Amino acid sequence: MAASCPCGSNRTYALCCKIAHKHHANVITPEQLMRSRYSAHVLGLVDYVVNTYHPSCHAEEQREGIAESIENDWCKLEVVKAEVGSNENEGFVEFNAYFDEDGKRYCMTERSRFVKEDGLWYYIDGTFPEDEPEPDPRLNQSVSSLKVGRNDPCICGSGKKFKKCCG
């Protein structure tokens, strides 16, 4: 029986990411590039990962760090959402990638941005939701139940203490 693709597409590797790994030009969507890059991590294909970064990223200079990230024990990929960007040459893919390290399971969540240039899709950058600050839970309270301490930051967003601003 043929091996299933590491990207979790439920297709065989030969009919899925191997096509992209053989020739970058075979990638036709940002999601396909993201899945093939994940599979390249699983399979240890450092060159493919480096070559599918956008040239402006100078990934060759970061080859050692990329190789280290590939050494993780990648377990599972979940594509959360794929969407078109501001035009047909930009796309975003949000995903969860699970890996084991030092006997613990971790989940990396990223919203990756891809751009198409000269007919080829490239990874250019990504944002990590855990890097974004958590919203203040008081912002979700109804006005009637809002409790603000006198020394808390003002709810108007001025940065002043509540007692010196709107309090």
UniProtKB/Swiss-Prot annotation:
Gene3D superfamilies: 3.10.450.50. PANTHER family: ADENYLATE CYCLASE-ASSOCIATED CAP C-TERMINAL DOMAIN-CONTAINING PROTEIN (PTHR33747:SF1), UPF0225 PROTEIN SCO1677 (PTHR33747). Belongs to the UPF0225 family. HAMAP family: UPF0225. NCBIfam families: PRK01617.1, PRK02250.1. This is UPF0225 protein VV1_2912. It comes from Vibrio vulnificus (strain CMCP6).
